[in-house]
Amino acid sequence: MNMKNIFLGFLSQIRSILMIFSNIFSFRETRLYPDEPLNLSLRYRGRIILTRNSNGSERCVACNLCSAVCPVNCISLKKSEEKNGRWYAKSFQINLSRCIFCGLCEEACPTMAIQLTPDIELSEFKRKELLYKKKNLLFSGPGKFSKYDFYSISGVNTTYDLKKNLSKKISNCVDVTDLLP
């Protein structure tokens, strides 16, 4: 019985050595990251950017859907209004030290202003530098969706004269007090 245990121990040692030698010459799965670039898919959720339309205007309409859907509340924004009535984000900031890169903000954005790109180099030495403001997030191009324009698809006209058209609609209204018994 003792000899049997010694023989099985010897066989397991030989098997371990053979396994090591067979893996020495096989293809290595580990990539040396800084020297060899990683091949990330286009759907990889990395750096968050704010995109612009093809005409250069910001896509964000400050609807607050991104901050409402964020599970860790890392997005905060303040809205303001242009002269033509269009809303825009006066200030927009994302705390990347809290962000879990879930992509819910990208899915909730109706204008496709927020997009997650396959960029993974987000490390900083100080935690305060992970608070990205609007100037850090703005991207010069349209991002992944170059042909998407929210205002042409939704049919919203920002040059609508409310006072002029409201007076026309009021004059066509029926006085409901005449219908009462």
Curated annotation (Swiss-Prot):
UniProt xrefs under SUPFAM superfamilies: 4Fe-4S ferredoxins
A single BP term in Gene Ontology: aerobic respiration
**Binding positions ([4Fe-4S] cluster 2):** C70, C99, C102, C105
Q: Offer a single GO CC term for the protein.
A: plasma membrane
Cofactors demanded by this protein? [4Fe-4S] cluster
Q: What is its EC number?
A: 7.1.1.-
Q: Which residues form the 4Fe-4S ferredoxin-type domain?
A: 51-80, 90-119
Residues bound to [4Fe-4S] cluster 1 are: C60, C63, C66, C109
Gene3D superfamilies from the entry? Answer: 3.30.70.3270
Q: What is this protein's name?
A: NADH-quinone oxidoreductase subunit I
